[in-house]
Amino acid sequence: QYNLHFINTPIELSPAVGKTPPIVDKYGLIYVIDEEMAEVKADPKKAFPLVIRANVYDCVDVLLSSEWDDDDFTNFQMSKVNIHPHFFQFDNQASDGVITGFSYDQSMRSYTQFTKKMKDGHHVSMPIPMNAKLLKATKPGDKTIEIKMAPHSPTYHVGADIIVGIEVPNGKDARWITNISPDPNKGEAKDGKYKITFSEGMTHAHAADQIVTTEYVRYRWWVDADVGLVFWHDHAFGATTWPHGGIGSTIVEPWGSTYHDPETGELIRSGPVADIHGTEPFAYSRNGSFRELVAQLHDTVPHTAQLVTAGNPPGLTRENAIAAGQSISFQMPSDMLEVAFPHLNGGTHTTGGGFNFRAASLASRLANNKDSSKLFSSKVHGEPSTPMLRAYVGDNIVFRLLHGMQNETHTFVVSGHGYRPERYDKDSRVTNALHIGIAERYDLATTAGGYQSMAGDYLYYDGRTSKLSEGEWGIIRVHDKKQKDLKVLPGNENFAKKAKKVLCPKGAPVKSFSVVAIDKELNFNANTEGEIEVDFERKLLLANAAGKIYALEGEAKQAAADGHMPHPLTLRVNIGDCVKVKLTNRLKSGNASFHANNIAFDPLKSQGINVGNNPGDQTVAPGKSK
């Protein structure tokens, strides 16, 4: 049973970073669980798209109500909301969310709205929602209530089902009306006051002024199979609600599972990070308990969008660049930052990315500290605001991946860890990078510590350059020692014995390479000019005078020669080889590093990225080798 509310509340997508202020969507629109609503409203840091869970064979009962009052600016003077799930079995006439053909209306308006803009004696657009307030307190067992309808609201009728105390967490009563006095069929009461009798007594006590309403919908979902992540969203005003958080996920867990806070072990009802305790299979050759991270990646969130400068018309002002992409449902802030990657080309702005409406903007971090080699360092910038998954070496992990919205495609990459895109198929190719389109979802199982079974901080991220700049990345923190604030996962009590300290096994063949990083002017197409005008003086850039490449030491002179167009460096090794790379930085400026993503490496020495709390510096300064 989930009692859900759709609320209008601020969302903090990113905290302040140095002098860069926090990124806050003041008009957040999200679903919350009844008992968590007050806490979420009080703290924008706790507001994000909802994640709830159900087990295989559960019948899920959802009661949805809304506090989103009519908004004359963005939604045609009338706010309605619903839930449309993508993968469950449900009655399409009553639990689809979408009102198709002769199906019932499965959406609702706000139960908090008691006034409406008036013009020439009439309300503007839709009338007041069917809301009322209790005139007198009631006791458990009472079958009658006295109410006063909102001014200009339509009146209830016999046979309708209404809710008393809808705003009270776990304290509401839904009842059928058997009698109304005075009879509204003979004319509405001038003072709006009515006495209502129900078919049965109420369960809870109710105070005077509590809200009485018809503005709610009850859905029922049948979870008959392990379908993993199920995407759902508002289907009434999606273009308005989605960019502000109006989406959610229900995770279908194995039969008999329980859901726990990783730090305390307590049972939880919602949230993107959870420990799932159980005994059933959840992927090929995997069963039992696992750590879970729900990664709802997205675009089309105006607050994390960034300005693109390369290839745009000379003299294009910030104001004009922002105005070129503004719309009623996509209101970008006037103080948005420029992208962290100056050679990013195409359009005047990015589209605003993140995970679970959280973004660790690289542009903000660069503004705070210009050393790009420290971009992902928690010791320099603090922890990212995106969800962090913590685990012990050998723990089972499942990434519940969703492209929640709305216009682009993405790639999901996990550093040092592999997964099968089809989790129950033993022949599904193990990879660490996955392309994902709009509304697609995957359930990706892996083992903490990855191919190398080593502790350390690893990255997960969106491989699109624009999304990475906006802050679509996070950390997987793997421990090999017991932590006070991280419970041990059932079935992996001996995790310390699984942790390796040495990467290559004794006797493994060694293959060595000497690689240099050099500056090289690049022309990506010898048959075209370096830039092509697309429209209105916007240019597609097909050359990079400030290019940087890798080359083998013995081939560096040829690669750097004028007129030579090198290919990206390819190194070949055999299965079972221990690969050693000496990297020399011959760039004029800036550190260099070498990150090989989908093979085993020591995350503390050879990841090539300074991630989280990992020690030392894994990059190479100009003129130095490592």
Give residue ranges: language-model regions.
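Short proline/glycine- and polar residue-rich coil/turn motifs
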Residues: 109-111, 137-139, 180-190, 211-214, ...
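N-terminal, post-signal-peptide metal-ligating segments of extracellular/periplasmic oxidoreductases
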Residues: 1-129, 213-218, 313-397, 478-625
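Short, surface-exposed loop/turn segments at beta-strand-coil junctions that are enriched for proline
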Residues: 222-226, 447-458, 465-467
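Short, well-ordered loop/turn sites that connect or cap secondary structure elements
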Residues: 54, 154-158, 206, 231, ...
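Extracytoplasmic/periplasmic copper-protein system
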Residues: 246-286, 438, 468-510
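Active/binding-pocket-proximal capping segment
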Residues: 405-408, 412-430, 466, 478-482
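A cross-kingdom feature marking solvent-exposed beta-strand/loop segments within repeated
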Residues: 420-447, 459, 604-624
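Autoprocessing Asn-cyclization modules and mimics
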Residues: 128-207
